[in-house]
Swiss-Prot record:
CDD domains: TPP_DXS, TPP_PYR_DXS_TK_like
Protein's UniProt name: 1-deoxy-D-xylulose-5-phosphate synthase
Binding-site list for Mg(2+): D144, N174
Function recorded in the entry: Catalyzes the acyloin condensation reaction between C atoms 2 and 3 of pyruvate and glyceraldehyde 3-phosphate to yield 1-deoxy-D-xylulose-5-phosphate (DXP).
EC number(s) per entry: 2.2.1.7
GO molecular function list: 1-deoxy-D-xylulose-5-phosphate synthase activity; magnesium ion binding; thiamine pyrophosphate binding
GO (cellular component) term, any one: cytosol
Assigned protein family: Belongs to the transketolase family. DXPS subfamily.
Single GO biological process annotation from the record: thiamine biosynthetic process
């Protein structure tokens, strides 16, 4: 059977090991071919090909439920559930999403983009099943470090207290999140994986049973039960932590041995109550380059399959905001032992890998544990340290109570650095950094700032380090800067709450925040061509606003436009409106930003065009709102 003929996962039932092996090879080929062309997550999906095939052969997905954690592990799942022929559209506008999406397929039983949610969701399904008197299996697949997340442990704690609720948790243990796993739980799992007794039983017992004449080949499920029993005799502590928490522990099992996996899952389905199946996999399996560099090939931009190297761009690009952040913070940390960079399993993505290499004592990776990261930072701040919590905008949402309760109420000087703020592109709605302005602006004692370019980012990093009167948050976008000159040292901090007037004008006031400042300057140029004179303010701070700069100009000019790369509800434009209202300045205001919608996966440029946030589109919207001279011809987006 060719994978293109498979439209339903139940077609896997009854296929031989040889046929499944052939399909596994087709999945890997398609996975590699597609990600090399479109970009996307590479290593996670390659590591779960056999796991997915074996599990789905033992389930009836007409009724059974499968919940994948994180979602980027699930590329093989997508190919096996009717999306193989469209898989080439992965992460492209209008194509297959890079994460699970209930709107995309009835087999995506629960959406996921963030980590550690699967066990909670699966347990909810299992409890609902039992309350309704229904009968189907529920399986959660958790991996890529997600078991280090507190929510996963909360769910395990709850599920273990429900001995009559049938639930299978498959632990895809590849020893990695994006970076290598950290913490006591991964260390415990490694002890199980590396136990000589367990390895001997796993590697040798099955082969010995196969040599029993006549019926050795047919003993697979029973053999699996015997292997589990012998592991417990040889190593009584195997899986003890999970057993003490109320789960029946099964494993570890070779995650790339189809025969052993099928037997293990068949055996696990017969065990009543919560069951945890520990599957040892290799991230990037089947692509030697990815197996060797599991961090670098967790996710990739388009690359050459033969060399593994990124496809060259037409011209050299300026450094990314993440790199500028990492380099600048590291230089400051080298001269200030109070500075500590904190990441939640995202060292490379945030640029803190630079700090990790050069000043390792001032670097902490807490694993996928944003809540812990924030409160730990708060504790460090009480002792005079300068904690810098470098967390993507979308992931900082996970620690909201800690920001409120442990940081803001106590007015502790924690410096939040939010990478990927704004439109992120192909990762889609689970990863868009749309909401941080709104969800942080409402908090007492919080200061918010955003740079117009990478040079201003450097100054804001120094500003955040120097600010000790409470928490301060810095947002900056995904991608490369503008190529402006950068200083190696001697950065001057900014005055809190002070913006800058970049351009004078008489007809219109553009007040832009962060990544929208340069586009605002382009808008002003377009408007100039149509006879409109626009002043441009780089706000720098969303809280506190520079009302001394904004309000007099708003009153004088009489027409205001705000520009932000974030949600309009409660965002930067709302802050300007509130300031105008409180000052009794009643002038027309146009807010440009992201409306009350989910921004689906597409390139950042495509998303901005869809939202009307390209400079020509914004200029057209402004002229439609406020009117233009009769001689004007509106410039539209091509």
């Amino acid at each position: 059977m060719h994978l293109s003929e498979l439209t339903h996962p139940n077609q896997l039932h009854g296929l031989s090991i040889a046929q499944l092996t052939q399909i596994a090879a087709q999945i890997r080929d398609k996975h590699l071919e597609t990600v090399a062309a479109t970009g996307g997550h590479l290593g996670p999906g390659l590591g779960v090909v056999e796991l997915t095939l074996a599990l789905y052969q033992t389930l009836d997905l007409e009724k059974d439920r499968v919940v994948w954690d994180v979602g980027h592990q699930a590329y093989p799942h997508k190919m096996l559930t009717g999306r193989y022929n469209n898989f080439h559209t992965l992460r492209q506008k209008g194509g297959i999403a890079g994460y699970l999406n209930r709107r995309e397929s009835p087999f995506d039983h629960f959406g996921a983009g963030h980590a550690s949610t699967s066990i909670s969701a699966a347990l909810g399904m299992a409890i609902a099943r039992d309350l309704k008197g229904e009968n189907f299996k529920v399986v959660a697949i958790i991996g890529d470090g997600a078991l280090t997340g507190g929510m996963a442990l909360e769910a395990i704690n709850h599920a273990g207290h429900l001995p009559h609720t049938n639930l299978m948790v498959v632990l895809n243990d590849n020893e990695m999140s994006i970076s290598p796993n950290v913490g006591a739980i991964p260390r415990y799992l490694n002890k199980i994986r590396l136990s000589p007794q367990v390895q001997f039983i796993t590697d040798n017992l099955e082969e010995q049973f196969k040599h029993i004449p006549f019926f050795g080949e047919n003993l697979t499920p029973e053999m699996q039960r015997l292997k589990e029993g012998m592991k417990r005799l040889a190593v009584p502590k195997v899986g003890a932590v999970f057993e003490e928490l109320g789960f029946t522990y099964v494993g570890p099992v070779d995650g790339h041995n189809l025969e052993e996996l099928i037997a293990t899952f068949q055996h696990a389905h017969t065990i009543p109550g919560p069951v945890l199946v520990h599957v040892a996999t290799v991230k990037g399996k089947g692509y030697a380059i990815a197996e060797k560099d599991q961090v670098g090939y967790h996710a990739q931009n388009p690359f050459d399959l033969v060399t593994g190297k990124a496809k060259p761009s037409s011209k050299p690009k300026p450094p990314s905001y993440s790199k500028v952040f990492g380099e600048t913070l590291t230089k400051l940390a080298e001269n200030d032992p109070r500075i500590v960079g904190i990441t939640a399993a995202m060292a490379t993505g945030t640029g803190l890998d630079i700090l990790q290499k050069r000043v390792p004592k001032q670097y902490i990776d807490v694993g996928i544990a944003e809540q812990h990261a924030v409160t730990m930072a708060a504790g460090m701040a009480t002792q005079g340290m300068r904690p810098v919590a470098a967390i993507y905008s979308t992931f900082l949402q996970r620690a909201y109570d800690q920001i409120v309760h442990d940081v803001c109420i106590q007015k502790l000087p924690v410096f939040f650095c939010m990478d990927r703020a704004g439109i992120v592109g192909a990762d889609g709605p689970t990863h868009q950094g749309m909401y941080d302005i709104a969800y942080l602006r409402c908090l007492p004692n919080m200061v918010l700032m955003a740079p117009k370019d990478e040079a201003e980012l450097q100054r804001m990093i120094v500003t955040g380090i120097n600010y000790t009167d409470g928490p301060i948050a810095l947002r900056y976008p995904r991608g490369n800067g503008y190529g402006v000159a950068l200083m190696e040292e001697g950065w001057e901090p900014l005055e809190i709450g002070k913006g800058e007037l970049l351009r004078s004008g008489e007809d219109l006031l553009l007040v832009a925040y962060g990544s929208m400042v340069y586009p605002a300057m382009q808008v002003a140029e377009i408007l100039k061509e149509h006879g409109m004179s626009a002043a441009v303010i780089n706000a720098r701070f969303a809280k506190p606003l520079d009302t001394e700069l904004i309000l007099p100009l708003a009153k004088q000019i009489g027409r205001v436009v705000t520009l932000e790369e974030g949600c309009l509800m409660g965002g930067f434009g709302s802050a300007v409106l509130e300031a105008l209202q409180e000052a009794d300045i009643l002038v027309p205001v146009l807010r440009l930003g992201v409306p009350d919608i989910l921004v689906e996966h597409a390139s950042p440029d495509e998303s901005k065009a869809d939202l009307g946030l390209t400079p020509p589109q914004m200029a057209e919207t402004i002229m439609q709102k406020f009117g233009v001279p009769q001689r004007a011809t509106v410039v539209t987006a091509s």
